[in-house]
Design a protein with these regions (language model features):
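DNA-contacting interfaces and partner/effector-binding or oligomerization modules
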Residues: 1-102
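Basic, Lys/Arg-enriched C-terminal extension of HTH/homeodomain DNA-binding domains
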Residues: 180-193
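C-terminal output helix
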Residues: 114-122
Length: 193
């Protein structure tokens, strides 16, 4: 996690979280310095004097795809008690929409296609506690596609994925093709980015 003071990401009952002077604004995973600086500059300067429950901005970029293929990352971030906002690139939008449909702790998915005014509106609603309607997303992965992606990223062959998912190889090829359409790049390109 990264806030302006480098506070570690801990459980919501931790003294570190309760004493955070930056009103609990965090970025996870905290590997991209520019992403962290941009988020903190935009949020802390605008909302520093307001009590907010806490927000974690998730750097949901393609280079972090391995983090987001099972539910453990959501469990980890939910333990803080913070609201979760996913900031994703175009390739990861379908996966981000899938996770938003799976868990209400994820309050929004922000993509590079949204205008600044729309992004500010989303963040305002979350900070001030307004309830946003949860829309069904057009481009969202399904459970089988996420499971396939998890197995493929772990290095399994299509045949072993077929066995593990208890389905025939033709169905696996259909899932692979569906993923390509929703993500916008091939599986090979996804794994090499």
């Amino acid at each position: 996690m990264a806030c302006g003071y480098g506070c570690p990401l801990t459980d919501k009952d931790s003294d570190i979280i309760k004493r955070c002077p930056l009103q609990k604004v965090a970025v996870w995973p905290s590997r991209n310095r520019f992403f962290i600086k941009g988020i903190l500059a935009a949020i802390t300067s605008r909302y520093e004097n307001i009590f907010i429950r806490g927000i974690i901005f998730v750097d949901f970029s393609i280079k972090h795809v391995r983090y987001f293929l099972n539910y453990s990352w959501i469990t980890y971030l939910k333990s803080t008690g913070f609201n979760i906002i996913i900031v994703c690139d175009a390739y990861m939008e379908a996966l981000a929409n899938y996770w938003m449909e799976q868990d209400s702790a994820i309050k929004a998915v922000i993509t590079n296609r949204k205008k600044i005014k729309e992004i500010k509106g989303i963040i305002n609603r979350i900070i001030y506690g307004a309830v946003s309607p949860r829309k069904i997303r057009l481009y969202s992965l399904n459970h089988d596609e996420v499971r396939f992606l998890e197995l493929a990223v772990s290095g399994k062959s299509l045949l072993s994925i077929s066995t593990e998912m208890n389905t025939n190889i033709k169905c696996i090829y259909n899932i692979k093709q569906s993923l390509r359409k929703k993500i916008g790049i091939s599986l090979n390109e996804l794994l090499t980015k």
